[in-house]
Amino acid sequence: MLFRSTHLRDVYDPTCGSGSLLLRVKKHIGEVDKIYGQELNNTTYNLARMNMILHDVHYADFDIKQDDTLERPQHIDQRFEAIVANPPFGIKWSADPIHLSDDRFAPYGRLAPSSKADYAFITHMIHQLDENGTLAVVMPHGVLFRGAAEGVIRRFIIEQKNYLDTIIGLPANLFYGTSIPAQLEIGRASCRERV
């Protein structure tokens, strides 16, 4: 079982879209005290808020913000018990060198390339994860094999942080809009203790 509880203090999705993944976690767990999300697209952000209300999530029990998660994170000072995400595959981002002084990216010594923000999202989520938290993120298979900066970041996550718990391969054509195969990566902060 991904989340070993029938109650979560909070759950966060940094690329929440319409909020369906957050609602799925709430349905699966049963009790989630607070739901957090961030979405870049204004229309989809409004849809996520409506979706929460339509699924009986009281407005005081969710905090969904509209902005660019990598450039202007809206929940940066919080740590979450559960993080779930299906970020857009291979999306571009600024990769501005100023981010090397950002706590989300600095420990790795390298930034995800501007042509693929996959590892920028992963390191953002690791930064936001509570010390006993669990994260589940859908990523393209390429994050397992690409070299250069992504290889450096991947090695640091596995060898230094020891956050990677499980990888589940997913078939091609599973997600609307992309035919490439994907994977579900599960990370647990508690993996650090199992070295």
Predicted regions mapped to residue ranges:
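Short, small-residue-biased leader/transition segments that mark boundaries at the very start
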Residues: M1-L2, E193-V195
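C-terminal substrate-recognition regions of SAM-dependent nucleic acid methyltransferases
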Residues: L129-D130, S190-R194
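Conserved Class I SAM-dependent methyltransferase catalytic core
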Residues: L111-I186
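Conserved S-adenosyl-L-methionine
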Residues: F3-A85, G90-K92, P97-H99, F105-Y108, ...
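Short, compositionally biased segments
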Residues: F3-T6, E185-S190
